[in-house]
From Swiss-Prot:
Annotated membrane topology: Multi-pass membrane protein
Name recorded for this polypeptide: Putative phosphate permease CPn_0680/CP_0067/CPj0680/CpB0707
Record lineage: Bacteria, Pseudomonadati, Chlamydiota, Chlamydiia, Chlamydiales
Function description: Potential transporter for phosphate.
Residues making up the signal peptide according to the UniProt record: none
GO molecular function, one term: phosphate transmembrane transporter activity
Regions that span the bilayer: 1-21, 42-62, 87-107, 112-132, 137-157, 180-200, 207-227, 260-280, 313-333, 364-384, 399-419
Amino acid sequence: MLPLIIFVLLCGFYTSWNIGANDVANAVGPSVGSGVLTLRQAVVIAAIFEFFGALLLGDRVAGTIESSIVSVTNPMIASGDYMYGMTAALLATGVWLQLASFFGWPVSTTHSIVGAVIGFGLVLGKGTIIYWNSVGIILISWILSPFMGGCVAYLIFSFIRRHIFYKNDPVLAMVRVAPFLAALVIMTLGTVMISGGVILKVSSTPWAVSGVLVCGLLSYIITFYYVHTKHCSYISDTPKKGSLTYRLKERGGNYGRKYLVVERIFAYLQIIVACFMAFAHGSNDVANAIAPVAGVLRQAYPASYTSYTLIRLMAFGGIGLVIGLAIWGWRVIETVGCKITELTPSRGFSVGMGSALTIALASILGLPISTTHVVVGAVLGIGLARGIRAINLNIIKDIVLSWFITLPAGALLSILFFFALRALFH
């Protein structure tokens, strides 16, 4: 038993590492592509907020993947076979992610793990131990998530263009709107944090809601003060190399001075959104690596398994994700940030806000949606607002194709690893 437990923990760390190396690009890639963050800054921000997102909210999605796809108590499935199956699903996910990262394929982590769990469920019970209703709900969420992300991003960007960029004085319009946008981001994040999680131990009490409102008010006041300072509207003709203004001029040299002021304000808002996006992504996707580990430990040590065991596992997975991000994450971050479509801070803000709202809502509801689906949907929403020619359709085709390949690939690898593990440890 102990060798299997050690092996599944190693597989959990390995898969978390690959999630960090591959999937975190969805959180901070737009910020790098728009020039708001350097690659190093993006990695640091993502590492911090991904870890705390996994620790504070990841337990909800972990519960969905662990026990809501296959029947743990079904008499057709032996305890040992369930542990072999979950370990096989975990290993299949890690191997497929690493293979995809090697070839630069933008695959879905959630597709892989859910497909892998379904794969060993088909082998053990010929489909009878799988909760097909739960699988159907998950599939519906995968279909809805890109539309939700796209619609929200489209509405946000359309609002920005109509009420800021199309005005006679876009700087004055931005000064009026920016405090409300900042308050929206902060209040949304606060709402997510009080809505769930094992560690926070807070609920939607009047005090908690009041705290969120106070944070939103403070963000409004701080932003209001900033946009009325001289520093906000000052644009140096020779900005310091490496500074935010320098990067924005380098990425979009045809900006007029007024539009550069507006985009720089959006740049600061996009940093807030990037933090929110990383937090939401960590709360949703680390569960893909930890849920099978939790399932094995629950079967092996039912008496000693508690909610705090899951907390420690989420922290363990968060560490693996951070290490994978730091070592190999730069590859996919550059791909997502620079190759799908041309991004500016205002567009990146719209993409990030639409994606973050969708992913955070899914985590609260316990739906293991695909972050890739949400981000691609948000980018498509921005593209539709600007015109279809603004989108790199070849990249979109590759992403959509990967959605169809990943789920069966996860299932097939899981089946192969299941028989190998049962032969090795049985």
